[in-house]
Amino acid sequence: MASHIGKLPIEIPAGVEVTINGQEFAAKGAKGSDSYTIPEGVTAKVEGNEIIVTANDDLRPTRAKHGLARSIVASMVKGVHDGYSKSLDIVGTGYRAQMKGKGIEFSLGYSHTITVNPPEGITLELPNPNQVIVKGTDKQAVGQVAANIRKLRAPEPYKGKGIKYSDEVIRRKAGKAGK
């Protein structure tokens, strides 16, 4: 019984260069490059224009790592070819953001401003003062930076003020019932 996800082949798009050296996997594409150490018990090989990830045995932990490794490798190949992005909206009177060097300075109703500097490989864009776009080749890093920005002022359920993902729907609550 193999991992359902792990046994799917990964197609290598045109313009992406893949190298496998033992347990080290590296992908290079138009948007950048990324590398990953494949876990013990799992091997990857290139056959034609596909990457095949296989488990060395049928033990439960190996099957779990098999699916994980295949998903991460597929995310890397997509990331170096297309890149990943997450869009956040800033909702609330007086809440805004402005570029400061490579980082962004947020005014979120606190007594001070908050500056967020992106890690290596992540870029922050500001199409307007109420929208932030996080871009990069690493899916996990893009999601983590977006989550850290959202955490600065999470949306509250009464008026919906705060930083939310663009596709997120905030569950609203009714206020106190008047007499």
Curated annotation (Swiss-Prot):
Keywords: Ribonucleoprotein, Ribosomal protein, RNA-binding, rRNA-binding. SUPFAM superfamilies: Ribosomal protein L6. GO terms for cellular component: cytosolic large ribosomal subunit. It comes from the Bacteria. GO terms for biological process: cytoplasmic translation. The keyword Ribonucleoprotein applies. One of its GO terms (molecular function) is rRNA binding. This protein binds to the 23S rRNA, and is important in its secondary structure. It is located near the subunit interface in the base of the L7/L12 stalk, and near the tRNA binding site of the peptidyltransferase center. NCBIfam families: L6_bact. PANTHER family: 60S/50S RIBOSOMAL PROTEIN L6/L9, LARGE RIBOSOMAL SUBUNIT PROTEIN UL6M. This is Large ribosomal subunit protein uL6. It comes from Bifidobacterium animalis subsp. lactis (strain AD011). The lineage of its organism: Bacteria, Bacillati, Actinomycetota, Actinomycetes, Bifidobacteriales.
